Structure formats: structure tokens, C-alpha cells
Amino acid sequence: MYNLLWKKIILIFVVSFIVVECSAQREQYRSQHDDLPYYFGATLGYNLSYLSAKKSEKFLAEDSILVAEPAASGGVTIGLQATFKLTKRLQARFNPLIVLGGARYFNYTLNSKYNTNEPIEQRYTLPTTVLSLPVSIKFNSDRIDNFRTYLLFGVKADVDLSANSTARNQEGYIKLKKYNYGVEAGVGFNLFLKFFTLTPELKISYGVNNILDREPNLKYSAVFESIQSRMIMFSLHFED
């Protein structure tokens, strides 16, 4: 935990140093960049994901399971991007990403009166690797020297590449759907350096469809009516 905190602090200082350096720079780097009809880049980031669940009537009516809570862990994000100029202030961006190392968890507390042959505390882990395909519109501010901010809004389609894995399809496990759709919003800023543009970005994603593949006869699945995904992502874009 402390290592992660120190990494975040160091990252903030590094980004702040670059901002100061760019702001102090009199010479405007890559001054013709805004005239490009399109440009490409690469993305490296980290995401914090979680699941929002609605309990079913079965869970409320019965007490064989006392607690049922979903959770999820973060993962490393890598990808490519293509950005296209629409107007002076508007750009369209396609940013396909692979989210690696994440997992989704389901924690249960069973009622000992009805579950004498099972541990009271249960956890089901579903390894997850996701292909994310977001399409976004960027609203750019005016450029000040080598610095510019922007707002971002868009939609995305996610494909769970682990959905058909053996670990995800064991008998009795809760199952999630392969496809997920959502909306996104974010904020970022461009730091125009001598040979490339560094773009830190913070984005939130809100899944709109139910990703639970509900099985009424499976007690670990039947306690949920619906599950939706949520994500917060910090990214560094390296743009040409």
C-alpha cells in the first residue's frame, strides 16, 4: 500500500515538474501540431475497477446467504490511439486498449444453519483480461505556450477475453457476460515537448448494461439481480 502511495507521489512530482518546465519555456515546441489532420500515439496506464450490484428478491427473501458483495481489482492498461481533427477545438479519438492483470471477486458469508458442509466465508475469483474499444470527442482549450487542457466524452465497447477460460467456467461459479458497453468522461492536458506530446489523463467509465449471466438455480448467482461495471483510469498518452 505504501509503495503504491509513494509511486503516486513521485508521479505527481514528475508531472508537476514537466508542467513547470513547459510553462516556463518561451519557445513553442511543435507549433504546427494543431494543423495536422490526424496523428497517432501509444497509451500506458493503470485502472481501478469495481462492480455495482443490485440484489435479487431471492436474496432478500431467504437467509441462506447473509452477505454477497462483488469487488474488483485494478490492472495495467496498454494501447494505441488515433486522433482526428474535426474543428479548431474538436477532435475525435479512437483508443483501443488491453487491460491486463485485473480480476473480479465475489465475497459471500453463508448462514451456518443451512451450510454445514461449506466454509462460512467464501470468495470466488474471476481472472479478467479486457479488450476495450473507446471512441471519444475531445474539447480542447486554447494552447498557452506548450500547455493545453481538454475535456473528453465518449462511449466504449469492452470484450472480456477471459470469458471462455477454464477458470471462468467451472461448475457452480457465478458467470459474467463477455460484452460490456459504457459511457466515459475525462479530463487531461497536453504537454508539448520537443519531440513528442505527453498527455496525462484521468477518465471515469460507467457501464450501462447488465453483465451478470444470471442462473436462477445457482445460489451464488441468484442472489444478484444485475451487475454493472465502473472504472477510474489514469493514463499517459505519448503522441507524435
Residue ranges and their predicted role:
Residues 50, 89-92, 145, 195-198:
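Repeated loop/turn-to-beta-strand initiation elements of outer-membrane beta-barrel proteins
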Residues 29, 178, 189-240:
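Predominantly the C-terminal beta-signal and adjacent terminal strand-loop region
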Residues 22-75, 239:
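Short glycine/proline- and aromatic-enriched beta-strand/turn motifs that initiate or cap beta-hairpins
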Residues 38-44, 92-96, 131-133, 149-155, ...:
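Transmembrane beta-strands of outer-membrane beta-barrel proteins
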Residues 54-69, 102-128, 161-176, 211-225:
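Flexible, solvent-exposed loop segments that connect beta-strands
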Residues 36-40, 72-76, 127-131, 147, ...:
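Residues that define the transmembrane beta-barrel architecture of outer-membrane proteins
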